[in-house]
Regions:
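Zn2+-dependent metallopeptidase catalytic domains
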Residues: 17-250
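Bacterial N-terminal signal peptides
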Residues: 7-15
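Bacterial N-terminal signal peptides that target proteins for export
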Residues: 1-6
Length: 250
């Protein structure tokens, strides 16, 4: 559950001056890096291979796969258990998280107009996908059954924590609301996701537009020479004399 909700928060701005590079427009979906295993150290996304056009099909496929995984849990004829319900749900959405982590990173620190437009397009889809899981009555019934019978399950501390957080995620996500209240909650969640995204993008634009121009090197006394050199290079790029700084958000 937490992984799914995380996917809806892609617009959080982690920082830095953005890039204005655009994709080359070539359809490379046949070699989409998200559809293969990473061969990078520690599973770091191979950003040098990832194009903007790779994200949307990977997100759509990721949501499709997780929906199928959730349906398999819901339609399991066996009695709900910790393994076939809680663990299965926690392990669902692997592809969705794979692309979400990469996209949120790029959208935060190396964004452009294409990526921001894609954020606007994906945000309501991800909000709906999250709600479709959180507000699935049959899925919640299975989770609730495991939660209410946990005393019989001999769970360790980690398992108990996962069960508790999963159950609370559903309750806080509106699983106990009636149909009308859930419909209203869906609308609010979509509005909130779009407002958060728009705020983040506007904040990033303001950050990127900021310039602090220092005319005299002595005013930078005490700063490392590497930082002073970087400021001079930034000023040169921006056609300014002296030393210029942008805001780095972390």
């Amino acid at each position: 559950m937490n992984k799914t909700l995380m996917a809806a928060g892609l617009a959080v701005v982690l920082g830095a001056c953005n890039s204005s590079k655009k994709s080359d427009g070539v359809d490379t979906s046949a070699v989409n890096p998200f559809f293969t295993e990473y061969t990078t150290p520690f599973g770091v996304p191979p950003f040098e291979q990832i194009k903007v056009e790779h994200y949307k099909p990977a997100f759509l496929k990721g949501m499709e796969e997780q929906t199928a995984e959730v349906e398999a849990i819901v339609n399991n004829p066996d009695k709900a258990t910790f393994e076939n319900t809680i663990v299965a749900l926690d392990r669902s959405g692997e592809l969705l998280m794979k692309v979400a982590y990469a996209f949120s990173g790029q959208a935060s620190v190396n964004t452009n107009d294409e990526i921001q437009a894609l954020e606007q397009e994906l945000s309501p889809l991800l909000s709906k996908h999250s709600d479709d899981i959180s507000l699935n009555p049959k899925l919640f019934a299975r989770v609730k059954s495991v939660y209410e019978n946990q005393a019989k399950l001999n769970l360790d501390k980690e398992q108990k924590k996962l069960l508790e957080e999963t159950y609370k995620g559903f309750v806080r996500g509106g699983a106990n609301l009636d149909a009308d209240e859930q419909a209203e909650l869906r609308k609010l969640n979509e509005q909130i996701s779009m407002l958060e995204l728009t705020f983040g993008q506007n904040s990033l634009k303001e950050t990127n537009a900021f310039q602090l121009v220092v005319d005299k090197k002595e005013d930078l006394s005490g700063l490392p020479e590497t930082l002073i050199a970087a400021a001079a290079a930034t000023a040169k790029d921006w056609m300014e004399s002296g030393f210029s700084h942008c805001i780095i958000r972390v």
